[in-house]
Amino acid sequence: FVSQIKLSKNFIKDRVKLALTEDLYPSGDVTSNLLKENKIITAKLICNQKAVIAGLLFAKQAFVQVDGKVKFLIKKKDGSLVKKNSLVATIKGKANSILIAERVALNFLSHISGIATKTNQFVKLAGKKCKICCTRKTIPNYRVIQKYAVKLGGGTNHRFNLSDEFLIKDNHIASSNIKSLVSNAIKNKKGKKITVE
């Protein structure tokens, strides 16, 4: 499976665009648009707990898509373990632009960092004798993002999709018999792993 997940700029752009569309449909941010358009502010993104930071490029992309003139300066790297009250990024630009993008940026950052942080806690508890693996039980269309977060937290990615390996489970066995399932898997193996649960 993929040992290092690389999220392309276009992938990140597309996901952020969907999130902004969801947040701003149909009339934009009517409250933030009440602010004076020229007021420039600087905001600090501070982590409120010890965490593994992940999803900074999603957060940055939210601000950039709302206003290309917003400056988002990343102070930590994705996968960094940060202490409580650490400065993660600074944002400078028009107040209304920053407030329009803020929630989408924070939602991505909180969700992805939350998965990475929780994974890291489990990895530390498990020690070196076992691996913490993630499954396909992910939010539809966000699997790559969630598996990226697990990887940053020190976890291991299991199957990305149904074609990665043969995984014969109780539901398969209930619909057939284990002997024929395993026999057919061996015939069609084509270099894929076969697992029976």
Description of each model-found segment:
Residues F1-E197:
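Acidic/glycine-rich phosphate/pyrophosphate-binding loops and surrounding catalytic core
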